[in-house]
Amino acid sequence: MSATKLTRREQRARAQHFIDTLEGTAFPNSKRIYITGTHPGVRVPMREIQLSPTLIGGSKEQPQYEENEAIPVYDTSGPYGDPQIAINVQQGLAKLRQPWIDARGDTEELTVRSSDYTRTRLADDGLDELRFSGLLTPKRAKTGRRVTQLHYARQGIITPEMEFIAIRENMGRERIRSEVLRHQHPGMSFGAHLPENITAEFVRDEVAAGRAIIPANINHPESEPMIIGRNFLVKVNANIGNSAVTSSIEEEVEKLVWSTRWGADTVMDLSTGRYIHETREWILRNSPVPIGTVPIYQALEKVNGIAEDLTWEAFRDTLLEQAEQGVDYFTIHAGVLLRYVPMTAKRLTGIVSRGGSIMAKWCLSHHQENFLYQHFREICEICAAYDVSLSLGDGLRPGSIQDANDEAQFAELHTLGELTKIAWEYDVQVMIEGPGHVPMQMIRRNMTEELEHCHEAPFYTLGPLTTDIAPGYDHFTSGIGAAMIGWFGCAMLCYVTPKEHLGLPNKEDVKQGLITYKIAVHAADLAKGHPGAQIRDNAMSKARFEFRWEDQFNLALDPFTARAYHDETLPQESGKVAHFCSMCGPKFCSMKISQEVRDYAAAQTIEVGMADMSENFRARGGEIYLRKEEA
């Protein structure tokens, strides 16, 4: 393994090559489609999986086929999933939302950046080689105006973003005609309200009630609108970010593109190393999905990593810097209060959240209340001016199953509920972060506590991991908990990669984490009964029963791995049409036997029916025509 490990220079060169040669790419036998809305510019991208026809009879010389409908699926890849779009990372993506933002007339361009740090970076000629060349002129709300999707929703306004989301959440299921494909088991939604058809008005109503958020900073016009809420599809977040130890700008852009290709609904940039500002600019200008950050990480860098030296002024400057770059949501650890820190003393693993430990250390060293809590209203004012959503961080989340659901965890959660109401006063969108490490029997309480004390604001959890014994497989241990809490009502799940607790994930780790979590959220959507969630499963089952191998590969979340595993034992082209796989072989294939039984039963029914008719014919004397009273 060590013989094939790339050097840092090789890793960067590979990432640079990826970026330089990047082009829109479709999955096997898929094509990009767009569904238009009523608002100008609303063209919702989806991936449509093309399927082969089913053989239904005929002869070898003249076979008869029945067409199978193409299956539309949700697509997070943006322009990177459209082969017709030319990609240029140096220029960034097209500004999809810019006309909608401008048309509202409630923003203004800034002549001077609000952040001292940003102005310093822009004045540094030594950063020219690293800097993204096409910098946007940032906008903010005009004086006295609020520009959040929550504000518009409360005013009764259906924005283009809301219509875009309604179309997207329906996943093109109105295109499906087959009753076999449309069949769906009733879900158990635990109080969630899942309409048969998601309308733009329903989206507006959910956002207005605070049950859902649309992360959409006015300075990130490249992003495609998406929604986070328990009455919608469960979403997945992927974490990327450089560190002081490893990774580079080109590698993080590569991981961003890779993440969106494999289904990340949002991406968090958790960079802690050099060039945080420049890295984030490249990511934002090339991201079709919302970008989140943890601003305290960069604020800490500004004071040389010394938590005690953090100040509100440095943190505020960081918020302005990131808001004007276009960050869509901030994780803020404002619920780590001074009086809660002693509650963690008896824990097995103490405080495991980086942001939580930073704020706990600051509180103890100054013996003062958390300055994020003290200045929370000012944080909300900043967010309202740019439409930055708040992700209220769980700094006291449990880091082991022994510490799950303890006093400190729920004390902080209740405080996050109080902060949610304050944020809503400013029309700021809010979601709540959750654990962590929780055994299966204790997971549901996390959801019920959050709904009750945080007023149904969307829940966003890391897993949770259901056992602590599997380093190297924590994408699996957490995927179990993720599927469960998604079913119970969690709105978004932060992926966990195989490298969790072990190291910084690479591209393959990112893919493994995302596929694991796409499985978890899909299982949750099925269990909740999200309309149309079962269509892809039904299409896969039909293809499997009919031995349409190519369709099985292409319907899979990861077509490449599915094909590779099949071809390990049946690599020949004949294996793609064989009515068996290598598991059972031709004589013991259950589905082949089932088909034979079905054909036999159908033949027997016809034969018995014909025999009955013949006997009836003879009983009536063999007359072709009968008198009316005999018929």
From Swiss-Prot:
Catalytic activity: 5-amino-1-(5-phospho-beta-D-ribosyl)imidazole + S-adenosyl-L-methionine = 4-amino-2-methyl-5-(phosphooxymethyl)pyrimidine + CO + 5'-deoxyadenosine + formate + L-methionine + 3 H(+)
Binding positions ([4Fe-4S] cluster): C581, C584, C589
UniProt EC number: 4.1.99.17
Gene3D superfamilies for this protein: 6.10.250.620, Radical SAM ThiC family, central domain
GO CC terms of this entry: cytosol
Keywords, sorted A to Z: 4Fe-4S, Iron, Iron-sulfur, Lyase, Metal-binding, S-adenosyl-L-methionine, Thiamine biosynthesis, Zinc
Top EC class of this enzyme: lyase
Record carries keyword 4Fe-4S: yes
Job description of the protein: Catalyzes the synthesis of the hydroxymethylpyrimidine phosphate (HMP-P) moiety of thiamine from aminoimidazole ribotide (AIR) in a radical S-adenosyl-L-methionine (SAM)-dependent reaction.
Protein known as: Phosphomethylpyrimidine synthase
Lineage: Bacteria, Pseudomonadati, Pseudomonadota, Gammaproteobacteria, Enterobacterales
Gene name of the encoded protein: thiC
